[in-house]
Amino acid sequence: MEAEEADVDVEGDVAAAAQPGNDESTASVFQDHYLDSTWRRENGCLPWTLDSTISDENRAIIEKMLLEEEYYLSNKSLPGKFWVNQKEDNKKYTNSLQKSSKAMVDSPAKPASHSVKWTVEEKELFEQGLAKFGRRWTKIATLLKSRTVLQVKSYARQYFKNKVKWDVEKETPTQKSSSDLQVKNKDDRTKAWAAACLRGSADPCLNAVKIEKLSDDEDVDITDELDELTSQTSQNSGSHLTLDVPNSKMYTTNQGELCQEGPLAKSSGESLQNVKQGEGEACSSSEIASWAEKQKSTDKNSAELNEKYNKVVEEHTLHRGEVREEAKHSPSPEPCERQDSSGNEMLLPPCQIEEENHEGEELKPPEQEVEIDRNVIQEEEKQAIPEFFEGRQTKTPERYLKIRNYILDQWEICKPKYLNKTSVRPGLKNCGDVNCIGRIHTYLELIGAINFGCEQAVYNRPQPLDKVRAADRKDAEAAYQLAWRLQSMRTRRRRVRDPWGNWCDAKDLEGQTFEHLSVEEMARRKEEEKCKPIKFSKASKLPKSSLDPFQLIPCNFFSEEKQEPFQVKVAAEALLIMNLHAHVSMAEVIGLLGGRYSEADKVLEVCAAEPCNSLSTGLQCEMDPVSQTQASETLALRGYSVIGWYHSHPAFDPNPSLRDIDTQAKYQSYFSRGGAKFIGMIVSPYNRSNPLPYSQITCLVISEEVSPDGTYRLPYKFEVQQMLEEPQWELVFEKTRWIIEKYRLSNSSVPMDRIFRRDSDLTCLQKLLECLRKTLSKVANCFIAEEFLTQIENLFLSNYKSKEENGLAEEDSTKELFM
């Protein structure tokens, strides 16, 4: 940490005594250590000070230049600003020879040219706030009113560093000796001289105050601590550090200065300043030698002085090891008393005490589930989640009730399954940030209101083994400490976005891909499977690797024994877009379904379909993540929620494959945690086993039932009802243009002017129009429907790729597909 500290001279520029004969000159503020000796004459005057033609302005500029050079050459940081003009009508020094200097980095919220000393009332209020609120600086600043949060934080830092308890000194009197750092000087005159030397000396080593590097938004307040320490030196012996020199003698130099033999003059000033920053280091021998070297230039008896100081240096070197050993036992800033196992009191640093306070007492899992009155907010809740009860406009008690009750409702729905934070967020939009929702969720879990009896519930975080355990604290308000531990209790998990753009746990999406086999690969694989049947031993279970993920599984039908969990109604607009999208590609296409779910009526309405881009590898295809996110946002802008997905089986049955079942089951589980529903729809436009020109559509969900061989969960098919609302014609035209532009140049595009099967006279385009006509027959006037179909036909004829442009290769592949 020492490398991060900087010595800031807060007195050197104004604290020097005036040169003889130049009391009024501004040059008198500079001491020998600021200028090289070659620039001085024998009488101590600077050459440029003798020139009376230099104006005051130029003289001030020269002084500033020399001061800057000294700071740069000595590797010191320049002050924020320093006054060089001595005109009383313009500027005045903020520090004088009779007052110790003060430095303050002001907060932007409270600008001031100088720092304001803390009053007795402010200090008393600070201590009251500290006892009441602890280390919550915002609360204490609100109590003070006259101080900002940063100023309170800065004062607290100095307050804790200079706080030394009397009872600690009383209990350890036998540990004090003449070699300790905390010793008292026997001579009152010597101590008074040391305090005066602290103020009057211009030695930068004496006037250096070590300041820890802080962030840009923190105040550094060193205004009144130094004054208090020097003024209370003779009264509060526990508030400063001095070095005891038992046989110290006083001597007078030829210039009449009162000095002390030994390192007291040096160590006294440093000790008083080191108390300010909480340091207990003894002055080194190099610092004493440096001080003697500077006295040599002004003292005629330098030989005698050096001889005496060399003796002191030797003695100091001999005892330095002992002093450092004693320094290890010196009390640290803000000592906290603690008793060890033997009953002896021990001192621990404040950072350790603070960490142990945060660990707190281990919470016990609730013994029984807690029932909470939905209309009442208990006092414990206000203590644990105080942010909703502090008068904020965005966080009100009503909003807290809404969030809490919604979480409790979701727990009742999913009980006994674990209710995580992610699953409750979709139903709490515009109710605050995810962190405050998470804190309420964790609080309810800790008290046993939700997730009671679930293995995933975490009530205590693991404690490091090498931590020093604090003694058990029996506090009446221990129950209210939950609020400080809400977010730190549970181990953080990696968060990722699901295909719909929502944040979720990474484990929720493991193994989920939208992959489907092309028609050619499906036929080839089936032939291979017939030629090479797989033989399993009777005792062995079906290996997972032997399962064909593209095997189609017929759907079961709901019955009286197993009724539909809800009804499914599909709007004409969604049917039109799904048919348009599925008819133009020999490869599978994918999209999202948007709509709404009515919990009261148990009805799921599919109001819109949003086509998405798909990525194909020849054997399988999956939805483009970017396109999925855009589609989800588009549905949200229209006021719809994502309630399902659709894809096509171009030339085979609209039954789900094993991979479709796995994907649908995972998304059902994910959306059901938040109370939402999620369905899957499969469109088969060119199924060879279907003699009719209409597409086959399957709407399904995956049940909890498992197949007889235990390899997959059983899919169930809904009886879909069509809604009687007219589609938004312009929106359908817009989607049609996008589909045509997307697939007209695609290698997998279907030639719409070709006969779609041998025993039919309809082209693919005419077949598409027949499907659309059947959909519109229930919702629109026949004239409006025919006009719409005519415009769709014109769009394909004018913009879609023709058979000749496709090439012979694609024509052959099309024949193989449809014939």
From Swiss-Prot:
GO MF annotation: an example:
metal ion binding
- Ranges spanned by the short sequence motif JAMM motif, renumbered to the chain: 647-660
Q: Report the residue ranges that make up the SWIRM domain in this protein.
A: 363-461
Tagged with keyword Transcription regulation: yes
GO BP annotations of the record are: chromatin remodeling; immune system process; pigmentation; positive regulation of transcription by RNA polymerase II; proteolysis; regulation of cell migration; regulation of hair follicle development; regulation of hemopoiesis
Which positions fall inside the SANT domain? 113-164
Keyword Nucleus belongs to the record: yes
Here the segments flagged for biased composition (Basic and acidic residues) are 318-340
Which stretches does UniProt call biased (Acidic residues)?
Answer: 1-12
Compositionally biased region (Polar residues): 230-240
Residues of the MPN domain: 568-700
Q: What's the Enzyme Commission number for this chain?
A: 3.4.19.-
| Gene Ontology cellular component terms for the protein in this record | cytoplasm; nucleolus; nucleoplasm; nucleus; protein-containing complex
Record-listed Phosphothreonine modification sites: 233
Q: What happens when the gene is disrupted?
A: Deficient mice elicit hyper-inflammatory responses, are more susceptible to septic shock, more resistant to RNA virus replication but exhibit early death upon DNA viral infection. They also show an impaired B-cell development. In a similar way, NK-cell and dendritic cell development is impaired in deletion mutant. An enhanced systemic inflammation can be observed characterized by higher cytokine levels, as well as the hepatocellular enzyme alanine aminotransferase, a marker of liver damage.
- Chain residues that bind Zn(2+): 647, 649, 660
Q: Where is this motif: LXXLL motif?
A: 765-769
Localization annotation: Nucleus; Cytoplasm
Q: Name one Pfam family in it.
A: JAB
Q: Positions modified as Phosphoserine?
A: 107, 215, 332
Similarity remark:
Belongs to the peptidase M67A family. MYSM1 subfamily.
Q: What does this protein do?
A: Metalloprotease with deubiquitinase activity that plays important regulator roles in hematopoietic stem cell function, blood cell production and immune response. Participates in the normal programming of B-cell responses to antigen after the maturation process. Within the cytoplasm, plays critical roles in the repression of innate immunity and autoimmunity. Removes 'Lys-63'-linked polyubiquitins from TRAF3 and TRAF6 complexes. Attenuates NOD2-mediated inflammation and tissue injury by promoting 'Lys-63'-linked deubiquitination of RIPK2 component.
Please report the name of this protein according to its UniProt entry.
Deubiquitinase MYSM1
Native species: Mus musculus
Please state the gene responsible for encoding this protein: Mysm1
